[in-house]
A protein has these predicted regions:
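Short, glycine-/small-residue-rich phosphate/pyrophosphate-handling segment
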Residues: 159-180
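A short, N-terminal amphipathic alpha-helix
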Residues: 43-61
Length: 235
């Protein structure tokens, strides 16, 4: 398994974790099928993942890791830049995988660990940096999504209880995570709400957002969307 740490800098060491998988048809963005074909959905997700990884590398933090299912490892090693650390998910279910990833990075000596998904290609660096800075005087940072989940979570110590008793992939994820954090007595900072591109209406919102954003935002996603438009015209 490839494991490439970022450069060690004086002072605080920060790690960004990205939950992702290889862009394989039938395994990624299945809720966009239809209207997309499995191949189109996988190609679009490839753009999402590459843009999220580029965003992470642009932060200049000491490590960017992609937390992935076992079957994705070799494919991601071929797709992603060598500066990216690949971390195979462990345990049973998403909660165990997130707990293990946070615990491992904190044990490696990182002072701040922030995790994002790979479903929001227009996300900017601002909420990630805000989440990291907030950990100076909070125990947990979190970014809610419009559908009741969260797209970001960060911590400076292993408060792994926040990943317990969560009904993952439901509209209750954010509320249950917050309830767990408050039950543990954690000080929580919430960054602004954002959205994941999971359903066809989200895809339309993404298209609209990209029209108003600078052309340098989400370049890989733009290329994938252009391919979709060309396919639609040809049919």
């Amino acid at each position: 398994m490839r494991r490439q740490a970022g450069a060690t800098l004086p002072g605080m060491r920060r790690a960004l974790l990205i939950v992702g998988k290889a862009p394989v048809p039938g395994q990624t963005k299945t809720r966009l099928v239809p209207p997309l074909s499995p191949e189109e959905a996988a190609d679009l997700y490839r753009g999402f993942l590459l843009d999220c990884v580029s965003l992470g590398l642009d932060l200049g933090w000491e490590r960017v890791s992609v937390v992935h299912p076992a079957w994705s490892g070799q494919l991601l090693a071929e797709l992603l830049p060598p500066r990216v650390t690949l971390v195979e998910q462990s345990g049973h279910g998403l909660g165990d995988a997130l707990s293990s990833a946070f615990e491992g990075h904190l044990a490696d000596g990182f002072d701040r660990v922030v995790l994002i998904g790979s479903d929001n290609p227009t996300l900017s660096r601002r909420p990630i940096r805000e989440a990291c800075d907030a950990l100076n005087d909070h125990d947990l940072s979190i970014g809610p999504t419009v559908d009741g989940g969260w797209y970001l979570i960060g911590m400076r110590a292993a408060h792994l209880g926040v990943f317990e008793n969560i009904e993952w992939s439901t509209p209750r994820v954010y509320a249950q995570t917050m309830a767990g954090a408050l039950g543990l007595g954690l000080r929580v900072h919430a960054v602004h709400e954002w959205y994941d591109v999971d359903e066809p209406p989200d895809l339309e919102r993404l298209r609209g957002d990209l029209l108003s954003l600078p052309s340098g935002v989400a370049p890989n996603t733009r290329v994938a969307l252009d391919r979709l438009s060309m396919t639609a015209v040809s049919h």
